[in-house]
């Protein structure tokens, strides 16, 4: 019995050591990625600011200003996403629940997304599927997740449309979704899209943190996330909340 107890203690210590080492490895990888991701827009801002000072043609100046503005937006988004992740990691993410008219909120989300959409060839539409629906839910976090998923759809949809909405699933869960007619995702890549700093298209702008934050927020609210996709036809990102 003494030997068995000692053996179990040794196994527990080995397991704890392996978990600690894996945690340190993930933190190191996170910091390395974060350093690279911050440096990229900063270099563009600094570099094109210097070039802008010497530019003479109005068209040339406008081009450099647009590049600087885009990288300013990217840097701000990156810092915001990192701050959100730090709250999630430390367990200090705040949740304030209130009674909410979902149809009214989704109309607001639709209007906001339409204002952000730069590609006029891809309309964004909210599809109401339920009559008046008032639920006790976390407004800010629901808006955050829907906005992140819509932003992701905008980046990869060049023609067609983007639709979103919600419906009752079974009797205990609400099912929320964003469907696009974008490039789609290969089967072997689906499991990676919710990882940190994952960008399936290295040329697309973004932090690679948005979907990871979505997953963390939804799981903190007791739900789950997923994606259904077909290459060349589009994707549906979804999540459920109790």
Model-derived features: positions:
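Short basic (Lys/Arg) and small-residue
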Residues: 27
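Short alpha-helical Gxxx[C/S/T] motif in the catalytic ATP-binding
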Residues: 210, 214
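PAS/GAF-family sensory domains
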Residues: 9-20
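Short alpha-helical segment of the dimerization/phosphotransfer core of two-component systems
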Residues: 70-75
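Short conserved segment of the HATPase_c
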Residues: 185-197, 237
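Helix-loop junction within the histidine kinase core
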Residues: 86-97
């Amino acid at each position: 019995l003494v030997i068995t107890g000692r053996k179990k203690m040794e196994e527990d210590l080995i397991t704890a050591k392996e978990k600690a080492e894996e945690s340190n490895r993930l933190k190191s990888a996170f910091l390395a990625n974060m350093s690279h991701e911050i440096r990229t827009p900063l270099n563009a801002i600094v570099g094109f600011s210097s070039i802008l000072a010497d530019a003479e043609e109005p068209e040339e100046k406008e081009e450099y200003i647009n590049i600087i503005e885009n990288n300013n937006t990217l840097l701000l988004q990156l810092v915001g996403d990192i701050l959100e992740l730090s709250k999630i990691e430390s367990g200090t993410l705040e949740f304030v629940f209130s009674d909410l008219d979902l149809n009214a909120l989704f109309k607001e989300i639709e209007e906001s997304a339409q204002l952000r959409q730069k590609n006029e060839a891809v309309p964004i539409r909210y599809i109401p599927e339920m009559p008046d629906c008032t639920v006790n839910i976390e407004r800010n976090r629901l808006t955050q997740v829907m906005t992140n998923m819509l932003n992701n759809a905008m980046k990869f949809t060049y023609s067609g449309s983007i639709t979103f909405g919600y419906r009752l699933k079974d009797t205990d869960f609400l099912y929320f979704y964003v469907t696009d007619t974008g490039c789609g995702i290969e089967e072997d890549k689906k499991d990676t899209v919710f990882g940190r700093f994952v960008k399936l298209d290295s040329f697309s702008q973004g932090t690679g943190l948005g979907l990871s934050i979505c997953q963390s927020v939804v799981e903190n609210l007791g739900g789950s996330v997923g994606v259904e996709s077909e290459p060349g036809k589009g994707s549906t990102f979804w999540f459920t909340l109790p």
